[in-house]
């Protein structure tokens, strides 16, 4: 009996040890799984850019073409395009057609919805172009494609919102074109980062119809932020959503006038603002910026102010924002003079180069 007793205890001890081992392994696997699921949403905070060489920067400057952008991308947008108008539809078709013509293989979607305005229900359509929808993380560049409704003018003129925001739309289209071969490598190169991609968002309904208020403004961004917050990402996920996939939300607005100054609005994205400053200095030092007398002409200083714009619905949900809007605003803001004649092509060309270098560095391309 004694021998059998020792055998039973040994067996019991073995079983208990095995059970504890299995429990430990299982718990470890579950914990590791949860951490793996959660960790990718934290990678944005430690993400580091790959700084381009002088040769890489010169290649960017050589590939971008502001005259081509002006003719092919900007001119078709310089029309009246308030939500629901024929011009709004034409501009959306133009944006989609330009992106779909590229080799990188963008996935283009429209987020169409009905929103209540002071003039009753109107239809709005955001455009979301994603380079690699299966990537967990997205660098987002955004602007609004609609124009403010100013009504008929006695001289027959219409408001075309050149800086607000036809030029930012054209800048994103030119970026996608100029960097097409580089962006294509995200999908095809084994050295690319499959978990990091680029997304371009063109919002509808940024402008107020009557007077800016929480309910009469930001129609498209309010709708899309809410939709992304309730959409699982990656597909099938149970505890992460599309909003969490946004590494950095870069919003362009009121760009195109001469001598803009862009302050840093948010301390938590200061390191990315600092990269823009560094890129501007480097391009200046290489003599690749036109009519640019100072190495820190565009991106300078901090501000305590907060400007209401399409980033607000995302900011309130915890998304990191880099807001590229000049302060002070262009003198032509919300006037009929916000037209092509008051744009400054060398400034737009310079900002194209800075933004394109920034994107390549962020995406480690």
Model-derived features with residue positions:
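Second-shell loop/turn segments in exported
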Residues: 56-64, 77-89, 113-118, 154-166, ...
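Structural recognition of the beta-strand scaffold that forms the well-ordered cores
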Residues: 128-130, 138-142, 199-202, 247-253, ...
């Amino acid at each position: 009996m004694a021998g059998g007793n020792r055998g039973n205890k040994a067996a019991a001890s073995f079983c208990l040890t095995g059970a504890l081992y299995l429990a430990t392994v299982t718990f470890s696997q579950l914990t590791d799984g949860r951490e793996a699921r959660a960790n990718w949403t934290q990678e944005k905070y430690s993400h580091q850019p790959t700084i381009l060489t002088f040769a890489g920067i010169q290649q960017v400057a050589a590939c971008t073409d502001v005259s081509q952008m002006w003719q092919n991308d900007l001119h078709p947008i310089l029309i009246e395009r308030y939500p629901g108008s024929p011009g709004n539809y034409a501009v959306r078709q133009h944006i989609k057609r330009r992106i779909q013509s590229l080799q990188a293989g963008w996935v283009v979607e429209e987020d169409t919805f009905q929103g209540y305005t002071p003039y009753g229900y109107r239809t709005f359509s955001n455009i979301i172009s994603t380079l690699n929808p299966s990537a967990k993380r997205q660098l987002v560049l955004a602007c609004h494609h609609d124009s403010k409704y100013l009504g008929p003018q006695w001289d027959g003129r219409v408001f075309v919102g050149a800086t607000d925001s036809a030029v930012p739309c054209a800048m994103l289209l030119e970026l996608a074109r100029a960097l097409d071969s580089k962006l294509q490598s995200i999908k095809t190169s084994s050295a690319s980062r499959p978990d990091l991609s680029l997304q371009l968002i063109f919002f509808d309904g940024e402008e107020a119809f009557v007077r800016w208020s929480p309910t009469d403004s930001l129609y498209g961004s309010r709708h899309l932020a809410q939709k992304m917050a309730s959409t699982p990402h990656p597909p099938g996920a149970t505890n992460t959503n599309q909003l969490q996939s946004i590494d950095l939300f870069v919003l362009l607005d009121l760009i195109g006038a001469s001598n803009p100054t862009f302050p840093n609005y948010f301390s938590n994205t200061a390191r990315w603002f600092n990269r823009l400053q560094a890129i501007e200095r480097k391009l200046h030092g290489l003599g690749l910026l036109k009519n640019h007398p100072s190495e820190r002409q565009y991106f300078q200083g901090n501000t305590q102010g907060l400007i209401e714009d399409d980033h607000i619905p995302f900011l309130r949900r915890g998304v990191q924002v880099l807001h590229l809007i000049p302060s002070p605003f262009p003198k032509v803001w919300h006037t009929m003079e916000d037209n092509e004649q008051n744009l400054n092509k060398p400034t737009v060309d310079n900002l194209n180069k800075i933004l394109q270098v920034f994107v390549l560095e962020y995406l480690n391309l």
